[in-house]
Amino acid sequence: MYKIEQKDFGYYLTFSGFIKKEEMEEWYKESLALLEKAPAHFGVFADLRDMKPLPAESQSVMEEGQKNYKQKGMVRSVVVLNSAIPTMQFKRIAKTTGIYQWERYIDASSNKDWEATGIAWIKDEIDPDAK
């Protein structure tokens, strides 16, 4: 399951469960339509806490989607996860798509303020990795 919400900072994406290629393609198409009306610069918050590891065919669609968000004006993004495998997958995808330097990863199991931490990165450039 996925959901895309528009927020004052940009887009809040929620993914949960097992995302097959067909559903990922639906997300991709919906994202393309939304991005046609996107502001020049925006952030993306991705809540993946309840998502299962992505199959390879879904990963490739996600990679194309991330490229589109970046090309349409994404300046920063944050990914919130609860599991090691999806964390590794999304770091690899971000490196492949060229957005790694603008993306931060938050482990919700060890950061109780994961949502506030993520929004602070998107809106105010407060880096959650800076200690």
Task: Identify the residue ranges that each predicted region occupies.
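Amphipathic, Lys/Arg-enriched alpha-helical "gate/interface" segment within cytosolic domains
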Residues: 1-131
